Amino acid sequence: MKTAMGLLLAIAATAVQADNLVVNVNLGGSASEQSAAFGVTHLEKGAFSDTFNFSPSAGTYAVDASLVTLGFSPRTDVTFTAAYVNGHELTLSGPGLFEYGFLLPAVITGPLALTVFGYVDFEDTSLTPASASYAGTLNISAVPEPGGYALLLAGLGVVAAAGLKRRRQGA
């Protein structure tokens, strides 16, 4: 009896869990600006937590991101509940047929990971699977290190000092 009850609880628990995904995404572009597109399809009803790891991503970047989903039937509808890039929260639209999310440019130190929380929910109690998807983009621009700014200021100071010295010698 205990085994049967435990088996039923295990089946019930898995019935409301969607597939949680971890996806590695390669950024492409130049050394100063890179971008990537990503997307997933959830085939199970329930809550999900998806993580996208972006590479290469060591360094400090100005990062912006977007998410979008469009589902006209309940089986194809994803509802976003939260999304974060390294703890920076994306602004999400409300639940509906068309949902989106975005992160305005923010300075973030890598490695970069986007975590998306949401759910696929529909009333049908049959074993028909879901087929709900969403997609997005992540863009990065290199941000100079503070040491780079210090070198720039030091260089400008040397140029200014040389200009003053010439000016005094010419007078």
Regions inferred by a protein language model and the residue ranges of each:
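Intrinsically disordered, low-complexity segments used for protein-protein interactions
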Residues: 99, 165-166
